Each structure stands twice: as C-alpha cells, then as structure tokens.
Amino acid sequence: MAKYAIGVDFGTLSCRALLVDVKTGEELATSVLDYPHSVMDEELPSGKKLGADWALQDPQDYLDVLKTTIPDVIKQSEVNAEDIIGLGLDFTACTVMPVKKDGTPLCFIDKFKDEPHAYVKLWKHHAAQAQATKLNEIAEKMNQDWLKLYGGKISSEWAIPKLWQILDEAPEVYDEADRFIEAADWIVWQMCGHEIRNSCCAGYKGMWNKKNGYPSDEFFKALDPRMEHVIDEKFSRDILPLGSKAGEVTAEFAAMTGLKEGTAVAVPIIDAHVFVPAVGITKPGEMLAIMGTSTCHMLLSEEEIPVPGISGVVADGILPGLYAYEAGQCCVGDHFQWFIDNCLPKSYYDEAEKQGVNIHKFLRQKCERKKPGESGLVALDWWNGVRSVLVDADLSGMMLGMTLRTKPEDIYRALIEATAYGTRMIIDVFRENGVDVNSFYAAGGISQKDPMTMQIYADVINMPIKIADCEQGGALGSAIYGACAAGAQKGGYDSLYDGAAALGKVKDKVYYPIPENVELYNKLFDEYKILHDYFGRGENNVMKRLKELKNS
C-alpha cells in the first residue's frame, strides 16, 4: 500500500502544499494560494499608516490558506487520509509574532487590532535597524564569541532586534506578549496543540547554538535591563532538532484540513534551508541558491569556520552531522519586479501584449541580444539593503553608466547582472575563509522560469549550475521532513539522508559557463567590487546620509 506525505511551503506572498508518494517521489497534487492580506508595508487593514522599512503580515492568513490547500491536495489526489503518514512545513524567517500563552496572536485581540507591533513582523521588516546596530556594538564591546558565527553582525531581520523594537516603541505590546515566536513554530503549535521551537530558526535567526545555547542573561541585560531574562520570559530553551517529530495532528486540526488525527508533524524548517534535501544535496562543498524575491545561499561543510558577512553557521542546521552555512541577498526578484512596476514605458507593455508574452519575457528577449558589457552599466543590487556580505539595511541601490542612449532592457539586464555579482561576492568570501564551494545548484522560481538569468549566473560565478527538478521545491523538501517524522516503520524514512537520496532531484539541463562571457564578466565584476567597497565599507556613506535626510 502506497504511503504519502504532505509538504507545506509558506513563502513571502503565498502558501504551497504538495502531496507526494514517499517511495516513488511522484507528486500527486499541488495547491497554491496567495495570502489575502499579502505583505502590509504601507498600512494596516484599518488604514493606519506604517513607517519606513516596515513589513507585516496577518497570521489569520496562514490559517486560512491551510484550510484550503491541504483539503485541496487530498481531494485532487484522491488518496485516503489514513495513508498520509507525515506532514512537514517550512516558513520564511525571521518571521515572528507576539502571542499569549495559549498561542493567540496579539493582533487577534480587539485592543491591539490597530497596533502595528501586534502583527507578524515579516522577514523583510527592516525597521529594527537601530536596535540591530546597538546590539552589534554591545556584542563587540563585550567580546561575545557567538557573534563571529554570524559573520560578525546580527541583522535587523532577526528575532532579538525585532523584539527590542517592540520594547522600545510599544512596551505595552511587549508586556502583554507571553511569548515571541517564529511563524513556523506557531503553525506547528496550531497543528499539534503545544508550543515548540525548532533548531533551524533558533540557530540562524535567534542567536542560539547547539553547544552553548543562547547568549547570557548578562548580555541581554546590557541591551536593556528589561530584557535580562528575555529568553525564559518570551522564548524557550527547549529546542527540537530537525528531522524529528514535533507532535501529531490534533482532532481540531484534522477536522479543519481532512487529515487523520495523529498524523506525524515534523519539526519545521526555514523556507530556504528546506530546499537542500529537495535537490538531493548531502555532501560538503555543495552550495544551493534559492532564487525568488530574495536569494538564500546554503552550503554544507564538515567544519565550523567563522566567515565574515554571512548570516550564520549552525551545527545540524539542515542535515545531522554537518555544519550548514547561510548567506543571502535580500533583493533579487524584487529588483526586477520594481523595475517592471515603475520604470517601463507604455510602448513596451503594448508590444508585449501584441506578441502575446508577459512583460518579463519580452524584456529578456531584448536583453538576450546584447553581450556582457555592451550596455556600459554596472549596478549595486541593494534596493532592499544588503544581507551578505555587508549586513547593512541602510545601504541602497545604484545604477552607474546611464546615458541618453540607455534603454529599459539595459537597466533590466544590469539589475540581473548585479544580483549575480552579489552571489559571486558570497562565494568568494567563503573560499577566502577556507570553506569549499565545489558545486552550485539553484532552486526557486527564477531558476525554473528564466534561462537567461541562469546563464548569466553561470558566466559570472564561472561554475556549472544544476537546477532543482521540482517547481515546488520548498514543499517537496518539507514533505521529505514529514516522511522522516513518520519514520520507516510507518512507511517513511529514519534518516534525512535516506529521504533526500530517495526523493531529491535535479533536471538534466545544466547551465555551463561560456568562456568568452566569463572573461567579460570578470572585468565587470572588478568594477562592481570597487563600487561595493567604496559605498558599502564606509569610504563614502552618501547612501546612509540620504536615508537620514529621507527619514528626518
């Protein structure tokens, strides 16, 4: 009798559920649904305006999409719920919310419905940069050893800066919140009926590590005396490892989704990290870039080596027995969409419509006619700040070399190239610090839909690129974790390595570097590095001064 697992992938804008045969890997059904409130970065549903760099979500959206997507894949596949042995999920991170001790989000409570700090702070909420800057200064002053495991800087995207922002700006929300929790863990709480904390989010976004736990109470007291016991008061020291079972589906959640009560639920994982088993990566030196609105770079190693500017290195962070490094770029697909939404003449839309192609494809067709360097443009890919390797949300984008002859497709291609240069910066910093990058894989929407961009990346990094063979790679990865939560006795797997080997897959198509393009891109990358260091490492802080004027 065939057995199945469901993987649920919570992205930035939508949720995807996938039902898969745990032995054959056959994908029987997929369901995708956008969040009703999407990303709230200008105002709350009430109309209350938000400040600069805010990005919120409504947790009710997460429950609503589950009520639709899980029943949908069960119905489509026509499988018996009795044969669905496991459920896994991944989520964006650090995406966090304040809740009561029973799990009720504060934004569900009437008196907080108009309070922005009561809502979910999405991963790309960057309004806690002031708190992140202070945290880094204090950590350096106190010689905190754990800081070097995060590239020497904590990001404004992470849990503690976001909670500290709440304490500074809305202390009544801080006081009312019994727990401050990752959305991934909150969803499992709704599924299983009890609070859990996963090692992936805690390790990469919460400053926890397997060996030493969290930073000391003394450190948190130095941030703010009110935060001295923040870990015990708002978080938890009980951290569950990846690849294990978080709990079982409750009767209430079973009734809501059509799953069987008692179905195994996996410890959740971050939405980027979950792609690693989905492409079958199990060896050190294999890097995976998950390319969507942003890009996250995952790399496995047998060694723990501090690397400046990365997002973190966590023991067993993806697979047991290996260190998993994370780096990333916080604006990739968002760059391209910004350009489409704001910078194209109507004539381009008219011509695309006439040809019967979407506007991205229309622009790419124009870009493909040009060779590297032909436009004379170099851009800095910082439209949403910088994650790796500068870790600075106060930096902004730049386009150099425009003339009266510059065309929209030139700018579009320069933005694509800039994101490729950013990935090469990340690869170079790993290698310079003794961490091998031997092979490169890509997953996510861009890798599936955009051959031109993938060829540019292969040329810029001068490495072959293998592509994930699953349009819903995040959901497939989550299904693998779900099958492992069930275990071999129930028809799943006892090891993530076994699950990845059986179900992970890549396409036959490989993008190989084109030597003449590599030579040209090496020259362009040298120019990118000059701009990167000049504007990003303090020689000229004009971007920060402009942002201060904008926000004054």
Where do the model's predicted regions map?
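Gly/Ser/Thr-rich active-site cleft segment
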Residues: 10-12, 136-270, 380-387, 412-416
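Conserved phosphate-binding catalytic cores of ATP/NTP-utilizing and phosphoryl-transfer enzymes
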Residues: 1, 250-259, 269-286
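Conserved phosphate-binding loops in N-terminal lobes of ATP-dependent enzymes
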Residues: 16, 29, 77, 81, ...
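N-terminal phosphate-binding loop and adjacent alpha-helix
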Residues: 32-80, 122
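Phosphate/pyrophosphate-binding loops at sites that engage ATP/ADP/AMP, CoA/4′-phosphopantetheine
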Residues: 66-85, 170-173, 219-232, 257, ...
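Stable alpha-helical structural segments in soluble proteins, enriched in small hydrophobic residues
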Residues: 65-77, 187, 276-279, 414, ...
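Glycine/Thr-rich phosphate-binding loops that ligate phosphate moieties of nucleotide
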Residues: 1-41, 60, 85-133, 141, ...
